[in-house]
Amino acid sequence: EILPLTSEAEIQTILDIFSVKKFSPTQTGTAIIIPYINKARLLHGIFPDNCGITAEEIAMCTFKDDIAQYIELAVQKWYAPRVYNKAVKEYAAQKWLAVRVNGNPITDANMRPLFRLVQELYTSALSANQGATQPYKSKAFPFIKCVSIPSQKLTGNKAGHAAYIRITKDEMGAGSSSINPYTYLRLFGKTSLNDPIVMFARTPGMILDYKIDDKWAKGLIK
């Protein structure tokens, strides 16, 4: 049976091995320590054989060879709605996440443009769902729109709101790389160059999945 450590002295001994400082009495959070790893084995298989991505694009994905970069990417991919998102507290009882990887912070200034967009979409939809008197308006992506999701099973025939945007590579911003969004999200085997990507998230601001869903997206967005 695996049980958590609860002895502060024992925990401190482990933290000292890795020169990691413990949280102060007023701090809460999660620290991920990955010791004694085989880097090559851990990063193996990020891009499987016959994934449909060109060798040139794979070569641009430097995160495939660097664990710190890969963790930064993974955090943004799954927690983008809350990473340094100070606007989220205006529309829900959620706190923004202050994330550091090897001591380096992830902020809105250095997030990858794709996940900065994901964050703005989430905040826009959250604002619409809360019926905010002053709905959130993205400065970075002003073309984001919100639509209601119809449902005959709920009062008001509405299940909430979804935020969406049609965007070009140039509109993603100067920091946008030549790496395809499908590559970042590991959506291999897409049928066209502009299949709509649907993001599913849960209340605390954690993303559950990204999927290519052409029929649902086109049915919702007229």
Per-range role (PLM):
Residues 1-222:
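Bergerat-fold GHKL/Histidine-kinase-like ATPase
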